[in-house]
Amino acid sequence: MQRPFLLAYLVLSLLFNSALGFPTALVPRGSSSSNITSSGPSSTPFSSATESFSTGTTVTPSSSKYPGSKTETSVSSTTETTIVPTTTTTSVITPSTTTITTTVCSTGTNSAGETTSGCSPKTITTTVPCSTSPSETASESTTTSPTTPVTTVVSTTVVTTEYSTSTKQGGEITTTFVTKNIPTTYLTTIAPTSSVTTVTNFTPTTITTTVCSTGTNSAGETTSGCSPKTVTTTVPCSTGTGEYTTEATAPVTTAVTTTVVTTESSTGTNSAGKTTTSYTTKSVPTTYVFDFGKGILDQSCGGVFSNNGSSQVQLRDVVLMNGTVVYDSNGAWDSSALEEWLQRQKKVSIERIFENIGPSAVYPSILPGVVIASPSQTHPDYFYQWIRDSALTINSIVSHSADPAIETLLQYLNVSFHLQRTNNTLGAGIGYTNDTVALGDPKWNVDNTAFTEPWGRPQNDGPALRSIAILKIIDYIKQSGTDLGAKYPFQSTADIFDDIVRWDLRFIIDHWNSSGFDLWEEVNGMHFFTLLVQLSAVDRSLSYFNASERSSPFVEELRQTRRDISKFLVDPANGFINGKYNYIVETPMIADTLRSGLDISTLLAANTVHDAPSASHLPFDINDPAVLNTLHHLMLHMRSIYPINDSSKNATGIALGRYPEDVYDGYGVGEGNPWVLATCAASTTLYQLIYRHISEQHDLVVPMNNDCSNAFWSELVFSNLTTLGNDEGYLILEFNTPAFNQTIQKIFQLADSFLVKLKATWEQTGN
């Protein structure tokens, strides 16, 4: 049997998110155009580079200078190219491009006497101004005459690691490692040539890819290192007609570093039985390839994403349901009605939340600190308290309420203290036994007595969510300087942690890998939501131990539990993420048989765990493609399931349910329906995505590969997004650029559209 969550807590969270005062420069909500506009003209020509470096070479000395030794040599190369500026006059209707290509090689001799070398082809491209006039679309070719030779300075270091083996008196074999660097420097002069160039039309853009190299260390293990590579191209755009002259200013220098440094270790046992470990720092050459002809997106002078002139990639329009156009390409996003409704609903939501927490004038039978799931006592009867619902409600109050009512929080702590120590159908409470199994009981009466009727037990997410909420209360008490007094069985934040939180953490340590019912109380197994909130609770708790406690056995158990849960979640063998699906699977044991695995609870988990940047080191962050693609697939499936979504457009928020196969209607089994909780979860995900990028000033990174990891971006945000094959390519929208700001605006409007759907439904039903 299923019952609804206390939905107001999440609505409250969303209202605060949607009303965030983002800087208008970053979220231009009133813009009337869906096009990306370019920045102002630049006066400096650009240089662009294509690098390709050889891999390292392993050689065996032919001499017997170092008996039994092997030498591993790798070439690291730093190339600096200087382009001497010239005065160039060209027609404004065409930019012209000049390309000079040379191959640079470096040679050196290592200490073993071997000669090694590495070569790099170097391509230098310069571009002259282009026109911004929309009517000037003609193409032509331009011949650029040779001017001044281009000199390339190459500094090459040959890194050699040698080792030799000897036998000490007594039979012990030892190995000695020596690392030597041999620098070489030389000049290469490139004679200028005449070059015929072809017209393109684009403005500043940054393209970033991640390049990885892999090698095998002396222990036979495969190691790898990755390096991000950014190429920025700049083409000045004129604002007039006729001829445009770019005056020589200063040399344009492009410096490229092309090595990935990794540290390798190998362990072995010598003849004396002693285990030894050696460490080697290795420079691994990598190959960077940038092809401007395969659909990487530039930002054009015309203000839209161009795909080499063959097609245009534009932000999708957002058109709302029920015949109400909230935004289209010819008008502005009208958010005033939504903002007014949010302010009213915010006030109502806060009032309703506190009415459901004892002591309540509306429901006098609720004991102080008890959070009821619903005031409904018949059809259905949810006049109970759930550990999960209570924790999520309190968490929302502490996180988002301007006045969290400290006495209410202390009363909630008091309820938690006593419920932990109350016997129930799962076992004895804390104090009667050291076994924590009874903490998995999810449902309690409003008078704090145990609910003893049959139910889905245990539910292992409750203690974790309670820990997360209480840790936030501890922070609030410390920040506000609240005096706890002697009214409750805890007189300090240390008491709260030791007497309540520590027991919930012990439950997680003991039972995280045990089966339990999911948050919908329907399936007994291992669940993504449960595991991720357990991981978060353990991770957050570790910062609350003082220096003397951090080496204690309990803290080490917590660290080990954190490692174990993290590994379990991301291991493809466990099914939460695998190659078959393009989304997170909530309960793998029933995927492919009873359900698709799609479930709104995965977004609820990500929203709860990653509510602050400090949790970004944990898996499945808000910007994780798996999280965003889960939202995309939920929208894709539920758009056609529920009749209320019939008039919704493809790139617009819809009413969402729990999972596509749901048959619970809120009271009985028949036909599933959308839920306020689920619909708001979608908005929360997008709001947190926006907040993360703006608050931390992060660039937007859009996957460009074709393994479906960019489904959210290609099908909800952009049109005609070209992929780059199987390589890990990315489109980078730099922070606070026009492209970044307008993309953020579209995501913001998509987030708002879920709430607009909710608003329209509530108004139609009189709520």
Curated annotation (Swiss-Prot):
Pfam families: Glyco_hydro_15
Reactions catalysed: Hydrolysis of terminal (1->4)-linked alpha-D-glucose residues successively from non-reducing ends of the chains with release of beta-D-glucose
Region (Y subunit): 692-767
InterPro entries: 6-hairpin_glycosidase_sf, 6hp_glycosidase-like_sf, GH15-like, Glucoamylase, Glucoamylase_active_site
Gene Ontology biological-process annotations: polysaccharide catabolic process
Top EC class for this record: hydrolase
Residues bound to substrate: W455
Statement: the UniProt record of this protein carries the keyword Hydrolase: yes
Region spans: H subunit: 348-691
Molecular function terms from GO: glucan 1,4-alpha-glucosidase activity
Glycosylation sites (chain numbering): N35, N308, N322, N414, N423, N434, N513, N546, N645, N650, N720, N741
Keywords: Carbohydrate metabolism, Glycoprotein, Glycosidase, Hydrolase, Polysaccharide degradation, Signal
Active-site residues annotated for this sequence: D518, E521
Known EC number: 3.2.1.3
Protein name: Glucoamylase S1
Organism: Saccharomyces cerevisiae (Baker's yeast)
Gene: STA1
